[in-house]
Amino acid sequence: SWAVRALGCKAGIVCTASHNPSKYNGYKAYGADGCQMTIEAADIVLSKINAVPMFGGAKLVDFDEGIKSGMIEFIKQDVIEAYLDEVQKQQIHPEVCATSGLKVVYTPLNGTGNKPVRAILKRIGVSEVTVVPEQEMPDGHFPTCPFPNPEIKEALHLGLELCKTVKPDLLLATDPDCDRVGIAVPGKDGNYVLFSGNEVGAMLLEYICKERIALGKMPKNPVAVKSIVSTAIADEIAKDYGVEMRNVLTGFKFIGEQIGYLEAAGEADRFIFGFEESYGYLGGSYVRDKDAVIGSMLICEMAAYYRSIGVSLLEAREAMYK
């Protein structure tokens, strides 16, 4: 989503394992706006695909030959660094993580999150990060769990076991294509408590609203967006802070579509947060898709901020429900 926009591409394709069993791959198609294609655009593309003869209709090129000819180019590091710059700009309290002493256990579940998540945490000052060793390196066979989905407790087994010895303040787990992130925090009995996507989404919304208002960083007529199946608590939080909540169909592309509407009106800065209950979060309009890199950053910042005022994430969750 970022690279399509940054490089001025007409479209983008992601072949992804996502959170599915290893025998499956996903295929995500993005438009020039960096948003996954909505129904209308997808129908047009599908009609073009169906018109291509099954045998011999597609022109093929050898991958190595494509590299040699310059037809295929790898994204350079400056594109990645520019992306991380934009993520980092979405911080609300930039100083809080470096002074918090926050301790994190992280697992990318053998997916793609290892480098970007650790890079952003290092940038914001979270220095005590322990990665689950068996799940650190990319492996499309996902040998440690049949379903590498952070929504499923079994996928977090190794991370939770490591928590018993490291005793972190926070466990982060990103799915293989690093667009969703799950968390667990220490409970009162010493065991780690998993939060739902609805809970994290609502807590992030409340944190963003409260702290942006306190710091004078809230835009005029702010907008948040969530899927219609996500918690109604977020609607109440938005109402309390004077934020317009837009509810859209399931699928983050519809949240991205709303950001596009705001951008077309010259009002992209009105967008403050978007989420869906399946652990997908986005703060800022720099991309048009859910992003576990900024999700991880904001969760760590929120945890560090509450820690700085003597409140745990468990206590913050309880206060939200009250």
Predicted segments with their positions:
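Conserved phosphate-binding catalytic cores of ATP/NTP-utilizing and phosphoryl-transfer enzymes
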Residues: 1-10, 149-169, 257-265
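Gly/Ser/Thr-enriched, mixed-charge loops and adjacent short helices
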Residues: 25-162
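Short Gly/Thr/Asp-enriched flexible loops that form oxyanion-binding sites at enzyme active sites
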Residues: 24-32, 179-198, 234
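Accessory "access/gating" subregions that flank catalytic or transport cores
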Residues: 106, 122, 158-174, 181-186
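Phosphate-binding and adjacent anionic-ligand microenvironments
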Residues: 164, 168-170, 174, 190-193, ...
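Ferredoxin-reductase
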Residues: 1-32
